[in-house]
């Protein structure tokens, strides 16, 4: 069966699979509005509380550099003990704020007002939606070189990629100084939902070429996907 990967990194552990293309995830351009002059004065962690997601490393970098850290994350039942025993003790003090899980609307303000997103993972992340969500808000990313990070973050343009926590601490000022307008532009160029949909259509058409069937009769007509349109469309998700 033909498969589509969400990053080239995702192919590494499944090299015998019939992967015919890589299509990066995308977001509607109007889902998050960018903030070019953030006033929050904090670093952001967005995701899930688990050992591989690196919230403890984000805490270490933030405290070493002396910048507050806000953590918007869910705690799955399987990770409750890890959160209680390893993370909760780190969250004492005015410089750290645990917000919990947030919705899409809250993400815009949370990420937009942040100086940078901390993406200090310790596993081969196949994509990492929070990175492009931050970019949509104009917020640069500080990330460890794992999994798909090098495919998503353009080093020196939409963020910086590092190889250690020590390097992350030294690099943080350069991340915060990046041009937020350029970060948003690159998000629009590379990670729109329209681009993603059109790439899937091209893949599907290429698989159907032997039957002379086209999935989209007029390929010249672009697909337009906005947050409002998605809200009105029924959808199915595979988890």
Language model regions located:
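C-terminal "capping" alpha-helix adjacent to the active site of nucleotide-linked donor transferases
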Residues: 160-182
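Conserved donor-binding/catalytic core segment of Leloir-type glycosyltransferases
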Residues: 2-4, 17-74
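Short glycine/serine-rich donor-binding loops of glycosyltransferases
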Residues: 128-131, 149
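A short, well-ordered alpha-helix in the C-terminal region of glycosyltransferases
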Residues: 177-202, 217-221
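Short acidic/histidine- and often glycine-rich active-site loop of Leloir-type glycosyltransferases
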Residues: 145-156, 160-163
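Nucleotide-activated donor-binding/catalytic signature segment of Leloir-type glycosyltransferases, i.e.
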Residues: 73, 84-105
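Short hydrophobic beta-strand element within catalytic cores of glycosyltransferases
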Residues: 136, 140-143, 153
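Acidic donor-binding loop of glycosyltransferase active sites
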Residues: 112-126, 139
């Amino acid at each position: 069966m033909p498969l589509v990967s969400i990053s080239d990194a995702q192919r590494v552990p499944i090299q015998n699979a019939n992967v015919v293309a890589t299509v990066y995830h995308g977001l509607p351009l109007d889902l998050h509005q960018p903030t070019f002059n953030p006033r929050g004065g904090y670093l952001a962690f967005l995701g899930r509380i688990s050992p591989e997601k690196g919230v403890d490393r984000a805490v270490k970098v933030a405290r070493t550099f002396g910048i507050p850290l806000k953590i918007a994350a869910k705690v799955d039942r399987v990770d409750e003990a890890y959160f209680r025993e390893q993370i909760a003790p780190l969250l004492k003090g005015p410089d750290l704020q645990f917000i919990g899980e947030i919705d899409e609307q809250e993400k815009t303000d949370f990420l937009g007002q942040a100086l940078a997103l901390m993406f200090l993972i310790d596993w081969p992340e196949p994509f990492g939606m929070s990175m492009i969500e931050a970019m949509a808000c104009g917020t640069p990313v500080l990330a460890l070189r794992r999994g798909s990070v090098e495919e998503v973050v353009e080093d020196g343009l939409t963020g910086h990629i590092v190889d250690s926590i020590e390097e992350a601490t030294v690099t943080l000022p350069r991340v915060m100084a990046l041009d937020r307008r350029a970060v948003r532009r690159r998000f629009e160029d590379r990670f729109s939902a329209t681009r993603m949909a059109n790439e899937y259509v091209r893949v599907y058409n290429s698989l159907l070429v032997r039957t002379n069937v086209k999935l989209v009769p007029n390929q010249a007509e672009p697909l337009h996907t906005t947050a409002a349109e998605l809200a009105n469309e029924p959808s199915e998700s595979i988890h």
